[in-house]
Amino acid sequence: MIVGVILFGGKGTRFSKDFPKQFLKFNGKALMEHTVEKFLLDCFEFLVVVSNKDYINKSIEILKKFEKKIYVIEGGKTREHSTFNAIKFLENKIDLEDIVLIHDGARPFVNKDIIEKNIENAKLFGATVTAISSENTIAVVENDFILSVPKRDSIFIIQTPQTFKYKVLKDSFFKFSNRLDNFTDDSSVVLASGYKVSITEGNKKNIKITTVEDLHLMGVDEIVGG
């Protein structure tokens, strides 16, 4: 079985003080709709949408038009706590060998090819993350001074989806359940648990929408508030 988890747990304060970015409308639909539509694929048994508790009802209202089975659950105080909530929600619904794909709700431009390659690599390796190679030289800095400059061919920019066998996620997140504030993405929790994580090639268009300017860069002109 394959399930998709889409994270909309934050309030998007960098985007707008008035409403979360998932409800911003462009090209006639809310950002949430654009993202979820990418996962209305036959391979997914069901989807889990993780929402800020204040917007669960609004999320349900937006998503009820889709025929796919979609559960809307409450998110946590951070991204990783939201992922952990989804992992616990899935405990009695799927088996340990099943595949769980986790995606940032603010990445509406993900495509089917990336999703399918994630699933394929998770089946092969147990854990995989979407990433693109860095075109820029990256420096490690401390106190405003450069400590080192890693080789560019070893630097990758992490995106989502991040996809795992359920047993890998469950083992990793329960192991670090009291230290999830130390992590910023799912793969770092899995790595800390001793698992290897493979790379699935992403693309530049699979950006995370953080500001209105990000949508303009993607060629979106008509943007309407939530």
Curated annotation (Swiss-Prot):
Tree of life domain: Bacteria
A molecular-function term among this protein's GO annotations: 2-C-methyl-D-erythritol 4-phosphate cytidylyltransferase activity
CDD domains: CDP-ME_synthetase
Pathway(s) annotated for this protein in UniProt: Isoprenoid biosynthesis; isopentenyl diphosphate biosynthesis via DXP pathway; isopentenyl diphosphate from 1-deoxy-D-xylulose 5-phosphate: step 2/6
Gene3D superfamilies: Spore Coat Polysaccharide Biosynthesis Protein SpsA, Chain A
Enzyme kind, highest EC tier: transferase
SUPFAM superfamilies for this protein: Nucleotide-diphospho-sugar transferases
An individual GO BP term: isopentenyl diphosphate biosynthetic process, methylerythritol 4-phosphate pathway
Record InterPro entries: IspD, IspD/TarI, IspD/TarI_cytidylyltransf_bact, ISPD_synthase_CS, Nucleotide-diphossugar_trans
Catalytic reaction annotation: 2-C-methyl-D-erythritol 4-phosphate + CTP + H(+) = 4-CDP-2-C-methyl-D-erythritol + diphosphate
Purpose of the protein: Catalyzes the formation of 4-diphosphocytidyl-2-C-methyl-D-erythritol from CTP and 2-C-methyl-D-erythritol 4-phosphate (MEP).
Name of the featured protein: 2-C-methyl-D-erythritol 4-phosphate cytidylyltransferase
Gene designation: ispD
